[in-house]
């Protein structure tokens, strides 16, 4: 008899504990339901990277002196520098330069230690491709001018999630009236109506 009562008591305790955990989970769910969305609707919305963002490396062929400092400071000896020694002017002549972004860890050592500043980090981060060999950028691909999110007219650049006010660690901690990333469909329709009336 005592054993049955103990089992019933344990079952009741377990039920109360399970109900408590379910209640805690639902409280978190309902708390998030009251908040504005923070989802970035990629690729139609993109975050503006911070000033020190380490994206695709930009290379200026004319500035490079083929010193190979970038290869020596790279933790994985990644940049491939092909050069020939010109006996007439007694200097190295750069023939080819390439970086494989499928292997690069974007540490920025090559940019920091380059004596002629021919390497720089850009804001580009969309390097995905179907073939891994396409990630091996030669001096022509590296020399392409960097692309910025704010230059694309089809994309809405979002600054809110990239730059939060001082002391705010989460976008949810912002005051209720402040602008947030992610708009309700009604707000988007209102914006479209106002822009169409202004253009007329």
Curated annotation (Swiss-Prot):
GO cellular component: plasma membrane-derived thylakoid membrane
EC number: 7.1.1.-
Species per Swiss-Prot/TrEMBL record: Gloeothece citriformis (strain PCC 7424) (Cyanothece sp. (strain PCC 7424))
Subunit details: NDH-1 is composed of at least 11 different subunits.
Name of the protein in question: NAD(P)H-quinone oxidoreductase subunit I
Required cofactor names: [4Fe-4S] cluster
Annotated region (Disordered), positions in chain: 172-200
Protein keywords: 4Fe-4S, Iron, Iron-sulfur, Membrane, Metal-binding, NAD, NADP, Plastoquinone, Quinone, Repeat, Thylakoid, Translocase
InterPro entries: 4Fe4S_Fe-S-bd, 4Fe4S_Fe_S_CS, NADH_quinone_OxRdtase_chainI, NDHI
Catalytic activity: a plastoquinone + NADH + (n+1) H(+)(in) = a plastoquinol + NAD(+) + n H(+)(out); a plastoquinone + NADPH + (n+1) H(+)(in) = a plastoquinol + NADP(+) + n H(+)(out)
Subcellular location: Cellular thylakoid membrane
Main function: NDH-1 shuttles electrons from an unknown electron donor, via FMN and iron-sulfur (Fe-S) centers, to quinones in the respiratory and/or the photosynthetic chain. The immediate electron acceptor for the enzyme in this species is believed to be plastoquinone. Couples the redox reaction to proton translocation, and thus conserves the redox energy in a proton gradient.
Keyword Iron: yes
Domain of life: Bacteria
Free-text comment on the cofactor: Binds 2 [4Fe-4S] clusters per subunit.
Disulfide bridge partners, by residue number: none
UniProt GO molecular function: 4 iron, 4 sulfur cluster binding; iron ion binding; NADH dehydrogenase (ubiquinone) activity; quinone binding
Domain 4Fe-4S ferredoxin-type: 55-84, 95-124
Family to which this protein belongs: Belongs to the complex I 23 kDa subunit family.
Keyword Iron: yes
NCBIfam families: ndhI (TIGR00403), NuoI (TIGR01971), PRK05888.1-3 (NF004537)
Binding locations of [4Fe-4S] cluster 2: 74, 104, 107, 110
UniProt binding sites for [4Fe-4S] cluster 1: 64, 67, 70, 114
């Amino acid at each position: 008899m005592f054993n049955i009562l103990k089992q019933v008591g344990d079952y009741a305790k377990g039920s109360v504990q399970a109900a408590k955990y379910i209640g805690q989970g639902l409280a978190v769910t309902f708390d998030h339901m009251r908040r504005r969305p923070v989802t970035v609707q990629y690729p139609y919305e993109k975050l503006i990277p911070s000033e020190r963002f380490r994206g695709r490396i930009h290379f200026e062929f004319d500035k490079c002196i083929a010193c190979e400092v970038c290869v020596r400071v790279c933790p994985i000896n990644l940049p491939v520098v092909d050069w020939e020694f010109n006996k007439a002017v007694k200097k190295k002549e750069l023939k080819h330069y390439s970086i494989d972004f499928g292997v690069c860890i974007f540490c920025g050592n090559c940019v920091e230690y380059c004596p002629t500043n021919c390497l720089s980090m850009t804001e580009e981060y969309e390097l995905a491709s179907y073939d891994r060999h396409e990630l091996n950028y030669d001096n022509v691909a590296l020399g392409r001018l960097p692309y910025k999110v704010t230059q694309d007219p089809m994309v809405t650049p979002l600054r809110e999630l990239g730059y939060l006010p001082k002391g705010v660690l989460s976008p949810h901690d912002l005051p209720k009236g402040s602008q947030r990333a992610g708009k309700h469909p009604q707000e988007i329709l209102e914006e479209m109506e106002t822009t169409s009336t202004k253009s007329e």
